[in-house]
């Protein structure tokens, strides 16, 4: 049995360490069993120390940002969940912003607007943190993180920091280098273009208006559940298979947008995974298209 509190007590306060923490409190789905240990570093140095300690103790760890695009299994997560949400710095440097991984994507987009920088409007309504968005190359409305990220500061499992410039980031559709090398995104630098604050704000408001109209923002959801196959619209296929409103327990296909799955009450991960499996089966039978989940599924099976 790992004495988690002792592992981190020399450099974290007691209120930065939680034991048996329900992950349902930390995901936008509102689903997930308990993590053995949940830690909340507040500086890059604390994050490095946490990673060094878990590596030395041979304890598995998982990096958590805003909990969007994430489905945690009902048995929870073994080892340590490292929450980046207290890393909150934003530094303005000319046409660039250096943004800590834990800053929400919406907050980063607002900061860009306030500095009269255009190019991040697409991200204003993307849920989760900027670190998570950079990790998965999140995108919307014909924009994606690969368009604006020029460098990433990351931390490896030995606690060492590295800077990767744009050419090394291996960005592709919902993919980045950090899905390959396992390093933790600590901070990103985005390069934007000078713009008119009013025009930027109007565009952000328009994108958010469209989201409110088309997406079930009032429900517990992880965003788009499936990656978009070339030449198809996922929501349209699911709807044409008669699955709009279809449910397994409290896991349900949104009536507002069939590409979104929602927790309509107290859904379990098992409910949601069974719903995902049924959708995949029906779409494959109807279209011959194999849907791939965009949502990351983690935890003890």
Predicted stretch roles:
Residues 3, 24, 42-45, 103, ...:
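Conserved active-site and cofactor/substrate-binding residues in soluble primary-metabolism enzymes
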Residues 18-19, 155-282, 286-301:
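Phosphate/pyrophosphate- and phosphate-bearing ligand-binding catalytic cores of soluble enzymes
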Residues 35, 68-72, 105, 131-135, ...:
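Short, flexible micro-motifs
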Residues 70, 109-112, 120-124, 137-144, ...:
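A generic local secondary-structure boundary/capping motif
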Residues 2-130:
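Anion-binding (especially nucleotide phosphate/pyrophosphate-binding) glycine-rich loop
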Residues 57, 64-66, 148, 219-220, ...:
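Short, basic and Ser/Thr-rich N-terminal targeting/leader segments
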Residues 92-96, 100, 105-106, 119, ...:
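Contiguous, small/hydrophobic- and glycine-enriched helical/loop subdomains that border
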Residues 32-33, 38-44, 71-89, 135-166, ...:
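Structural signature of FAD isoalloxazine-binding scaffolds in flavoprotein oxidoreductases
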């Amino acid at each position: 049995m790992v004495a988690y509190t002792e592992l981190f007590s020399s450099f974290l306060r007691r209120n930065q360490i939680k034991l048996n923490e329900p992950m349902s409190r930390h995901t936008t789905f509102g689903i997930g069993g308990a993590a053995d240990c949940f830690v909340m570093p507040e500086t890059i140095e604390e994050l490095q120390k946490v990673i060094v300690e878990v590596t030395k103790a041979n304890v598995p760890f998982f990096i958590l940002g805003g909990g969007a695009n994430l489905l945690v299994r009902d048995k929870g997560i073994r080892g340590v969940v490292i929450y980046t949400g207290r890393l909150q710095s934003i530094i303005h440097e000319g046409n660039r912003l250096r943004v800590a991984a834990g800053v929400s994507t919406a907050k980063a987009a607002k900061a860009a607007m306030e500095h009269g920088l255009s190019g991040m409007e697409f991200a204003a309504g993307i849920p989760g943190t900027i670190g998570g968005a950079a990790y998965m190359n999140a995108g919307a409305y014909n924009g994606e993180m690969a368009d604006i990220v020029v460098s990433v500061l990351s931390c490896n499992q030995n606690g060492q920091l590295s800077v990767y410039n744009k050419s090394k980031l291996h960005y592709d559709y919902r993919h980045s280098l950090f899905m390959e090398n396992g390093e933790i995104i600590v901070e990103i630098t985005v390069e934007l273009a000078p713009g008119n604050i009013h025009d930027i704000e109007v565009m952000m408001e328009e994108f958010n208006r469209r989201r409110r109209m088309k997406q079930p923002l009032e429900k517990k959801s992880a965003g788009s559940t499936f990656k978009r196959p070339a030449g198809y619209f996922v929501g349209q296929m699911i709807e044409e298979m008669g699955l709009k409103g279809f449910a397994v327990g409290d896991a349900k296909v949104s009536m507002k947008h069939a590409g979104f799955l929602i927790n309509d009450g107290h859904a379990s991960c098992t409910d949601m995974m069974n719903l995902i499996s049924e959708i995949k089966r029906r779409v494959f039978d109807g279209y011959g298209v194999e849907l791939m989940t965009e949502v990351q599924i983690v935890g003890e099976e």
